[in-house]
Amino acid sequence: MTMTDPIADMLTRLRNASAAKHETVDMPYSKFKKNIAEILKREGYIADFTAKEARVGQTLEVTLKYGPHGERSIQGIKRVSKPGLRRYAKSDALPMPLGGLGIAIISTSSGLLTQKECLDRGIGGEIVAYVW
């Protein structure tokens, strides 16, 4: 059976694994998911990620990051633009999750960027997710 929203599935796997204090989480691989993982690693929300060969296709293994006392790096993660209702924002109306404490992942013509990078470049796009 095909999955309706693989990005929401990825975000849910990350949220659930983080809440359950798992060290790693596996998910089906795609370039879009890899780009999201790159942003999460660059912003300090995950420790690392690798693409591994599976029985069928590839899987993306994400190593989660925790604080010195076991506190989660990803406190919350929310899918914004969905297949049934796409959400777009111009460069002058980009969201600032939690007043700038979180990040918004934006899909632009220049690839996936955070809202801060979009503001610097003056471009808008589709709001994929909020992470805080």
From Swiss-Prot:
GO terms for biological process: translation. Keywords: Ribonucleoprotein, Ribosomal protein, RNA-binding, rRNA-binding. GO terms for cellular component: ribonucleoprotein complex; ribosome. The keyword Nucleus does not apply. GO terms for molecular function: rRNA binding; structural constituent of ribosome. Part of the 30S ribosomal subunit. Contacts proteins S5 and S12. Belongs to the universal ribosomal protein uS8 family. One of the primary rRNA binding proteins, it binds directly to 16S rRNA central domain where it helps coordinate assembly of the platform of the 30S subunit. This is Small ribosomal subunit protein uS8. It comes from Bifidobacterium animalis subsp. lactis (strain AD011). The lineage of its organism: Bacteria, Bacillati, Actinomycetota, Actinomycetes, Bifidobacteriales.
